[in-house]
Amino acid sequence: MKEIILCKYGEIALKGLNKSTFESMMVKTIKRRLRSAGEFKVTRSQSTLYVEPLGEDVDVDEYMERLSKVFGIVKLCRCGALEKDIRVICEKAPEYAAEALENARTFKVNAKRSDKAFPYKSPEICSELGGAILDKFPHLKVDVHDPDVTVTVEVREDHAFVHTDPIDGAGGIPVGSSGRAMLLLSGGIDSPVAGYMMARRGAVVEAIHFEAPPYTSDRARMKVESLAKLMTPWCGDIKFFCVPFTEIQLLLKKNCPEELFTILMRRLMMEIAQRVCDKEGDIQALITGESLGQVASQTMYAMVCTDAACRMPVFRPCVGMDKSEIVDIARKIGTFETSILPYEDCCTVFTPKHPKTRPSVEEVEKAQNSFDFEPYIQKAVEDTTVTLIKNR
């Protein structure tokens, strides 16, 4: 029996005249994510994408795992594709669902008939197939309210598809449908989650990291590169920019008020990130993992001072989330265990003892203008390295 994966989408179906554009983006993403999994074919019809693995010894579970990380898909169904004949459905559907049914006590049948030319209506399909299942598995009982197994038959244009265990997709909209943004990627828990959340809303995510050797180690940089790699199954390939930041941090420590160190550092990071974006081209925004009030540098006053140095919009998708909520997402996307590895990053090595939580833009700008950072900013941008981190 031929197996096909049905990829169902949610809000894309509501995009009106732009729907086909979103579908095309999702097809491109699927082809990139599955390129190393083997041969396959992708078609689309009736607000569903059909992924058909080709060849022998195909690992359909591997296809399902990769597709579960494609934004835009809300449900994935591993299906047996049957001839649209009620006798074939009643014969083959119980066989396809046998593994699930053998270990169950109760079941129900759910039928969806989008092909209205099919001679049996949905209740009739349920009745016929339910009877066939009871004949083959007499230990089962019907429970339409809380069954152990639901056998679903979808009668569509070309085939009848049978499945038992749909899984949730990643949701959101396809990567690439909402522009391109630069993520300030530290070694912590929050910034990978912020990148994931923006990718889920269609942004192509690139990443920029600031390192401060010898105060930060090669292992710290490798940790951040590993985080970027862990993001690629969700976000796709990521350009990873690494900025040498030691000299600027030492100058800040020497020439600026200690209580404003972190805010001034973040302002200079934003300025460098924007210039790297200008140099790269076609990047519309910055992303940070800041959460309102989580630490002293993430008060509303501090964010206002940071944003005053920005020409580009700054997205903070974690801004209204508790730490526990951010951790839950980090665990889900597979970045948490790497994020908590105990390597210093440049944001922590020079942390002031008593950071100011209610700075004003005027005093921060005055402190920054007390020293000419411009030549050092230019040098940091020139010395920035870039690596393409690929998904698989």
State the predicted function of each range.
Residues 1-182, 192-239, 247, 279, ...:
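RNA-binding accessory domains that recognize and position tRNA/RNA substrates
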Residues 128-133, 166, 170-178, 245, ...:
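Active-site adenylate/phosphate-handling loop in enzymes that bind or generate adenylated species
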Residues 183, 207-209, 242, 288, ...:
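Structural beta-sheet core signal
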Residues 188:
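Conserved G/P- and acidic residue-centered "switch" motifs that form tight phosphate/ATP-binding loops
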Residues 292-294, 342-350:
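Small/polar glycine-rich anion-binding or flexible loop at a beta-alpha turn
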Residues 334-342:
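A short alpha-helix-loop-beta-strand transition element characteristic
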Residues 342-344, 364-367:
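Mobile late-domain/C-terminal helix-loop "cap" segments
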